[in-house]
Amino acid sequence: MMTEYIRISGIVTEIHWINPHSWIFLEVTDAEGGSAVWALEGASVTELRRRGWVEDSVEPGDRISARCHQLRDRSNGCLLGYVTPEGGEEKLFD
């Protein structure tokens, strides 16, 4: 069971509104100034629409923060929990 969230922030490089799972690719800058792209897996498009998300809610170039469950191998990937667009409210994305 995944119970621990990490919080990451960055710039959206790609977003895929597809079924059965949506994907956000996020360029994240670390404390040393290096950057890496993280793959964030979210709910299906159908489920996201039920929660009030639409295709232009998050777009490439947007700055977002996310609370997600990092992959067990600690690579740059997460199962999304919540997304907060810059200047917006945190909403469930899974």
Task: Please give the residue ranges for each predicted region.
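OB-fold/S1-family single-stranded nucleic acid-binding modules
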Residues: 71-94
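Short aromatic-glycine-enriched beta-strand elements
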Residues: 18-29
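Short nucleic-acid-contacting surface segments enriched for D/E, G, S/T with interspersed K/R
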Residues: 49-66
